[in-house]
Amino acid sequence: MASLIQVRDLLALRGRMEATQISHTLHAPQPMIDAMLNQLEIMGKAVRIPEEPDGCLSGSCKSCPEGKACLREWWALR
């Protein structure tokens, strides 16, 4: 079972990661990693980095049927 310290250490080693990458690396369920990242954010230890929509190749994310699912969210230590 992953701990907050393991999530923090992984972010320290890798710089920035997506929650799904952290989940796969630590072999932990995605909802648990999401909760841990939110807790680290509340504690002021981690920061959420949303991907900018200007990276969209077609430029039509607002009308995209995926609903901006192509935009990724990164996490990094503060």
From Swiss-Prot:
It comes from the Bacteria. Pfam families: FeoC (PF09012). Iron-sulfur cluster binds at C56, C61, C64, C70. The keyword Cytoplasm does not apply. InterPro entries: FeoC, Tscrpt_reg_HTH_FeoC, WH-like_DNA-bd_sf, WH_DNA-bd_sf. Transmembrane segments: none annotated. May function as a transcriptional regulator that controls feoABC expression. This is Probable [Fe-S]-dependent transcriptional repressor. The gene is feoC.
